Curated annotation (Swiss-Prot):
ATP 2 binds at residues 514, 604. GO terms for molecular function: ATP binding; ATP hydrolysis activity; DNA helicase activity; single-stranded DNA binding. A motif (Arginine finger) lies at residues 513-516. This is DNA replication licensing factor MCM7. The modification Phosphoserine is found at residues 314, 365, 500, 678. It comes from Mus musculus. The gene is Mcm7. There is a cross-link at residues 15, 28 (Glycyl lysine isopeptide (Lys-Gly) (interchain with G-Cter in SUMO2)).
Amino acid sequence: MALKDYAIEKEKVKKFLQEFYYENELGKKQFKYGTQLVHLAHREQVALYVDLDDIAEDDPELVDSICENAKRYSRLFGDVVQELLPEYKEKEVVNKDVLDVYIEHRLMMEQRSRDPGAVRNPQNQYPSELMRRFELYFRGPSSSKPRVIREVRADSVGKLLTVRGIVTRVSEVKPRMVVATYTCDQCGAETYQPIQSPTFMPLIMCPSQECQTNRSGGRLYLQTRGSKFVKFQEMKIQEHSDQVPVGNIPRSITVVLEGENTRIAQPGDHVSVTGIFLPVLRTGFQQMAQGLLSETYLEAHWIVKMTKSDDDVSGAGELSSEELKQIAEEDFYEKLAASIAPEIYGHEDVKKALLLLLVGGVDQSPQGMKIRGNIHICLMGDPGVAKSQLLSYIDRLAPRSQYTTGRGSSGVGLTAAVLRDSVSGELTLEGGALVLADQGVCCIDEFDKMAEADRTAIHEVMEQQTISIAKAGILTTLNARCSILAAANPAYGRYNPRRSLEQNVQLPAALLSRFDLLWLIQDRPDRDNDLRLAQHITYVHQHSRQPPAQFEPLDMKLMRRYIAMCHERQPTVPESLADYITAAYVEMRREARASKDATYTSARTLLAILRLSTALARLRMVDIVEKEDVNEAIRLMEMSKDSLLGEKGQTARTQRPADVIFATIRELVSRGRSVHFSEAEQRCISRGFTPAQFQAALDEYEELNVWQVNTSRTRITFV
């Protein structure tokens, strides 16, 4: 590769900044960087972002050179901008800061003491870092793909690259010294020391000509008002869980932020960072102990906070016609659900619920109050019913997920920990599992084994979707907009239907009510089911894959892409369904009161029905929730409640409408032998029965000669 002539490169840069333009809506030329240079000259703008896509239109070779040797070209661009600024300065700067006044005062004093026509002493020149009052950053070309953090190796040193990850730790913003200014106590001369490394050795002896000639040995004292500082922040980003090979620890990289790039991201944010990959330069005694190894960091130039759809690279792009044909079948809902953990036999309704958890409902924010759209599910059951297998599959399937166990998780491990920063010694926040799973799924196994003090940290996350921190003087709120999928075992080995739900699982009612679906998976002896399950397990062990089914399960990547497409939809509930949903909820409340239900049916149940309905509408890629979606949501809710009742409760819930109507009318005639027909009909309809069911019950018990109805049908009399 031929050596670059940087004088020619400098002319190219100058020409680009002066001449690059685009045509606006009126067809007039708009000089993009010329306008920004005017703002920089007048101090109306601090940072100049150079888009490499703009350079690629005229000179693709220059873009390659910048990407290969970004640090050198960053200084080159800075020098060119500094030279051009006086040409673009149209007026004097009104708002001057301390450094402006300091430099102007020094120049004025020096001019007074200098003879007329004399040339300024080059030793008194101010360093370019002190005079430069702007920041220059590159924005990477759109053609370059983001790298995985573990693929950033030694061959990337000095190059401009883009990495994606999740922010795990952010330090406080502090001032970093760029130029140190000293004053001599003997001759009064000023000395400037540009600082390039993280640490520096302050100057002690005055290097001026006067002190050296007189041998006065003047000592230098640091002038903080004349020194230049920039905002400095350090951030750690960790690679996403789907980028980590099985059995490996997630890699992380240190990102250094300066100036206008600070205070952009918080722990838990998913970011895309474009920057220069550099080694840490040690000086002084640290250089002697450094050895052959060097720490590295990314000098950030461009930071973008990403949404979930931006983050899922595989979700980008439309589905092909073949892929759409695979999904667009009549039973696509069943097919998608059965494609979740196909090696696990049965659990069809549980898999449907897990599919809806991945799709999620729609967030609502009426007048500032946030109603979550994420669906929470708790799987309970006897040991050996594949709860943990379902959790681990969802962890692999979800684009963003965190997997943890209750016994090995502390409260700070789930929410956020306050750690002391190794660089500055300051206290910093490091996000836990729930923060890192923001806009994803957090799978918590052995939920019942968690300590009570640690479990209380989840209450706020499940409803408010935030984590409030008040530790060691740090008061802040972090986002934790994640769905929680928990698995718990019964307290006494197996689920006892004679005990209440709280006694079986030993979880507080306040926490259980926050779950949209509580699913009990019991291991009941059944010859046919046991035979099919045993055949399924032996086949999986023999062939290391699931048995041949009636259909081919969908590929995991295809499911991820389809779920990402579903997230783009924002379905709404039409007014025509409002009364239907309300009546269904009232009926569920009535049934829960009549049958002494194991779970508490509250207003959260109604919100759960709405969330499940909107998730089903999203799954069908429509913008309006239909009655079938509501019915399926209610069916899943009923199935989850039925699973909690056990064999004893199954008969109680499946009581015939005629028998319930008979019991209702018998309550009305507790004082006498007859009751008004209209009163009985009104009472039964208010309890959710239809007039047809009421009439059928009347006819049935009249045939049995239990009661008689008079000819005018105004009175019911017991025989």
